A protein has these predicted regions:
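Flexible N-terminal pre-Rossmann segment of NAD(P)-dependent oxidoreductases
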Residues: 1-12, 212-213
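Conserved glycine-rich cofactor-binding loop
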Residues: 16-17
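Conserved glycine-rich Rossmann-like NAD(P)H-binding loop of the short-chain dehydrogenase/reductase
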Residues: 30-46
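Rossmann-fold cofactor-recognition segment
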Residues: 50-65
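Conserved NAD(P)H cofactor-binding loop of Rossmann-fold oxidoreductase domains
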Residues: 85-94
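Catalytic loop of short-chain dehydrogenase/reductase
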Residues: 96-116, 127-181, 189-191
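C-terminal helical subdomain
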Residues: 172-224
Length: 224
């Protein structure tokens, strides 16, 4: 049974991919208000045309000032958000360690930069929510790095470290306020996301119905 997200507002950061489409559909079915942020206006228009009842925001999530402005627009139009699913990503690699170029790394690190900006901009929202959720997609390669994917795995490892720091911040804020923990930061690991988009979407929706204290600072392997 799908957990009801009526009254919840969720931001999909970089949500124009297949994973973003699957997540948007699942969230809408569950009753959430969905906002998709991305930098490609054509992809946003196609997504809106296919799903209709969601909001889209054109934004370069790797630009700190642009994300600050995005947060202002979202708050003005929708109020605080209850969830953020970070889907900015991609793969570049191969060629062993010698093939790990700076050019590839700069492209890959955009995902981590976007996560830093978005998670900071909406941190107060998630902490204030009765069920705040931040979720990122990482890789099983973090547990077993390979030379040909060193750039990619380094970015994913940084993503996990940042997400765990967010989790600690959620726990500390609740403890300092003398309140139960209601926000959770979650890491979803995949070997490859292709074919797991629906499962990712379902797991993210289900996370809103799970106990935050149990869920916060956890790694969920979707490849098993």
């Amino acid at each position: 049974m799908t957990h009801s997200l009526n009254g919840r507002t969720v931001l999909l950061a970089g949500g124009t991919s297949a994973a973003g489409r699957a997540a948007a559909r699942a969230l809408l079915v569950a009753g959430a208000e969905v906002i998709v942020a991305g930098r490609d206006p054509e992809k946003l228009e196609v997504l809106s045309g296919n799903l209709g009842s969601l909001a889209t925001e054109e934004c370069d999530l790797a630009d700190e000032a642009a994300v600050h402005e995005l947060a202002g627009r979202v708050h003005a139009a929708h109020g605080r958000v209850d969830g953020v699913l970070h889907l900015v990503g991609g793969w570049r690699g191969g060629g062993g360690l010698a093939g790990q170029t700076d050019a590839d790394y700069r492209v890959l690190e955009t995902s981590f930069t976007a996560l830093r900006h978005v998670s900071r901009a909406f941190d107060a929202d998630l902490r204030a929510s009765s069920a705040g959720r931040l979720a990122v997609v990482s890789s099983t390669s973090v547990a077993r790095p390979l030379a040909g994917g060193a750039n990619y795995t380094a970015v994913k490892a940084a993503t996990e470290a940042w997400s765990r720091a967010v989790a600690q911040g959620f726990a500390k804020a609740a403890r300092d306020a003398g309140e139960p923990l209601r926000a959770a930061s979650i890491i979803f690991r995949v070997k490859a996301l292709d074919g797991l988009e629906e499962r990712l979407a379902d797991e993210f929706v289900a996370s809103f119905g799970r106990d935050a204290a149990t869920l916060n600072d956890t790694v969920i392997d979707l490849s098993t």
